[in-house]
Amino acid sequence: MTDADDLRRRTAELLAAHPPATTDRLEFLRARFDAGLAWVHFPQGLGGLDAPRSLQAVVDAELEGTGAPDNDPGRIGIGLGMAAPTILRFGTEEQKQRFLRPLWTGEEVWCQLFSEPGAGSDLAALATRAVREGGAEAGGDWIVDGQKVWTSSAHLARWAILIARTDPDVPKHRGISYFVCDMTDPGVEVRPLRQITGEAEFNEVFLTGVRIPDAHRLGAVGEGWKVAQTTLMNERVAIGGARTPREGGMIGIAAAGWRAHPELRTHDLHQRLLNLWVEAEVARLTGERLRQQLSPTLNSSPTLGSARAGGPPCAGGAPMGQPGPEGSGMKLAFARLAQEISGWEVEFLAEDGLTYDDWTMRRPDGVDFTGREAGYRYLRAKGNSIEGGTSEVLLNIVAERVLGLPPEPRTDKDVAWKDLPR
């Protein structure tokens, strides 16, 4: 049984064998992965030790201050937060061995090819087609044609998680399959989408005759929607449930500005800041509780053969160790707080808060809410209630799958995708 003392010993051995001051960055990250200290809740041989997720903090604390490099999580967040848990749950052993190590070390960046111009909030209506070469029974490669949009990191990515329609003759949720797509395929074209900040974090991706071997399919043919739910639930936890210290993140910046500028204070702004501070702390503690629900290990699904399979559910009905719909609530809280805090900050700083004059076209590796000016935060936060699931859709998920309220009526449940009006 791996405990905190065992992890401290293993970390000390890693540092002794690979001193950060004299070890190449990539060599150190690979050694850390091989030692099971990358994500301790993953299985042995895949960067982990089958330990409780909560013990990752022990490893992080032991490495802090040693000069040990990190894997640049802001740059590879889609791989860490979405692709990795999906591959772990639904991938073959060969897929896990091939993809997880370079994903974690940052050698290979991942992106997500889900949303389409006509399938955003109604993602299951997607139209990108994947057709089996030689027919459904031939066992050949898949040829993919279509368009995806709002794709973060597509301009950096080596791989993409992709959902595409493989059967248009069944209802929309049942005709989808899930693939790993090679972003270097000559049929992949990435175009930047410029945002309100002037940057282009996002992209639109055109797929023309892209060839995907069947060995790069995750899950069974036609069960891609089930696989995608794991990705989406993990995405919302990754966005809304990131660990922050008390008074960290955007609320910390707002509080620091308040302390630094007494001449700008008013009673109304003070009361609003206090309310936002309390709400941010409630959200932080709720995130801690969610992580405790996930803390046993990710090995809680029948796919992984864990003794915990079928164990006690989280609040939203998912097994312990797997995110459930309650993660949607965390993402909702994050989006609302980011917008309200950034709005408060702009109002507090008056004309200085509106200063944002760098409209240079850039392709950043990620979002930097804490290292930029207030005007940037205000503009960028507007997208938080859209990306990763719109707040309106997430409210429906919380209502139906957490609170148990009646679902919205659906008229297309048994209608083949090809017969849906478009």
Where do the model's predicted regions map?
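Alpha-helix capping/hinge segments and adjacent helical runs
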Residues: 20, 328, 332-422
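Glycine-rich beta->alpha junctions and the first turn(s) of the following alpha-helix
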Residues: 188-285, 300-304, 308, 313-319, ...
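C-terminal helix-coil-helix/basic helical segment that borders enzyme active sites and/or dimer interfaces
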Residues: 267, 281-308, 313-366
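A short, Trp-centered hydrophobic/proline-enriched beta-strand micro-motif
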Residues: 106-114, 163
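Amphipathic, small/basic residue-rich leader segments at the start of a protein or domain
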Residues: 1-77, 88-90, 98, 102, ...
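A structural signal for short hydrophobic beta-strand segments in well-ordered beta-sheet cores
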Residues: 128-132
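A short core secondary-structure module
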Residues: 140-141, 145-191
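Glycine-rich phosphate/pyrophosphate-binding beta-alpha loops
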Residues: 119, 149-154, 196-197, 383-388
